[in-house]
C-alpha cells in the first residue's frame, strides 16, 4: 500500500513537472480597454490559471526612464497583479516599446552610456512598485548600427537585475520579443549574445504576410507552402525557429509566437486561391476597427456564411465570403503548433494577445473563454 501511494505521488509529481516545463506566455494590450461593447477587455477578464506568464503591453520611456503610457496604467497594473492573489505561481512582466514606440527612440537611449544607465536604473524600482516580476524588451526592428547597442542594453539590464536581487528579493525576469523575419533578425539581433542574458525570447512567428504584398497569403503558416515562391521560403514558423536555433538561441529559452488574430484582404477578382490579387486590406472589424486585421472573436462572427479552407501543407485555415479573404488560426492549427514546439523541445508558446481571443466565451459558440489559448494550454499540459 505504501509503495503504491509513493508511486502515485511520484506520477503526480512528474505530471506537475511536465506541465510546468512549458511556458505559456500571454500578452495583454492596454488599448483593448477602449474597444466598444463586448470588445472591451480589462485585466480582470484574464483567467489567472490560463498562462504561466502574462505580459502587459506597453510601457513608455520618458526622459530616459521607464514610465506609464495610458492615463490609467497604474490602476490596470494593480488589476493585473491582483490575479496573483488567486494564483501565486503566475508571473507578470511589463513590456516596454512596441511597434508604435519607434526603433529610433530606443536607439537614442541605448547608444549613449549615460542615457542607457539612467533607463536601466529606473526599471527595477518601477517594476517592484507596481508588482511586476520582470521586464520584456520589445525593441522591434533595430537597425544594423543598433545590434551591438541592443546587446549591451540586454547585458547591462541583466547585470542590474542580478545586483538588485542581492538584497534578498527574487531576481526580476528579463525577456525580449524578436520578429521572425530573417532579414529583421540578421539586421538587428545578435541572437547568441542576447540569449545568454535573457530568461526567454518570444519569437513573433506571425505577420509573415500582409496587404503590402498585393496578393493573399497566410500570415502565420507553420510550414512552407508547396506553392510558395523561393522568396517566401523563410516566411514560416518552422524556418524561423530552425534559424534561431542555428544562430545560437537555446531551445529551452525560445518561445514560439501564436496569434489570436487574423489578417484580412479585399479581393481584386473572383480568384480566391494562393496568390490571388487584392485591392487592399480587408474591411475593419466591428470591435478592432482596423483595416486588414480581425480578432479571433470577430473571425468567429465572419465565419457564419463563409467558405472555410485549410492549407494542408502550411497547416493553417483561411475563409472567404464575398470579396473578403481572411487568414487565421483555429483550435486545430494552434494545437498543431503546440505539438510542433514540443517536438522541437522549445521553452513554450507565446500568445498575442489574450484580448484578441474570445475572452468572453460568447462569440465562438463553444461557451468557452479563451478557446485558442486554452487549446494551446491543453496540448502543453499533456505528457
Curated annotation (Swiss-Prot):
GO terms for molecular function: carbohydrate binding; chitin binding. Chitin binds at residues 70-71, 97-100, 141, 204-207, 263, 352. Disulfide bonds join 26-51, 300-364. The keyword Endoplasmic reticulum applies. Glycans are attached at residues 60, 367. GO terms for biological process: activation of NF-kappaB-inducing kinase activity; apoptotic process; carbohydrate metabolic process; cellular response to tumor necrosis factor; chitin catabolic process; inflammatory response; lung development; positive regulation of angiogenesis. Mammary secretions collected during the non-lactating period. Residues 324-338 are annotated as: Important for AKT1 activation and IL8 production. InterPro entries: Chitinase_II/V-like_cat, Chitinase_insertion_sf, Glyco_hydro18_cat, Glycoside_hydrolase_SF, Glycosyl_Hydrlase_18. Glycosylated. Residues 22-383 form the GH18 domain. Residues 1-21 form the signal peptide. Belongs to the glycosyl hydrolase 18 family. Carbohydrate-binding lectin with a preference for chitin. Has no chitinase activity. May play a role in tissue remodeling and in the capacity of cells to respond to and cope with changes in their environment. Plays a role in T-helper cell type 2 (Th2) inflammatory response and IL-13-induced inflammation, regulating allergen sensitization, inflammatory cell apoptosis, dendritic cell accumulation and M2 macrophage differentiation. Facilitates invasion of pathogenic enteric bacteria into colonic mucosa and lymphoid organs. This is Chitinase-3-like protein 1.
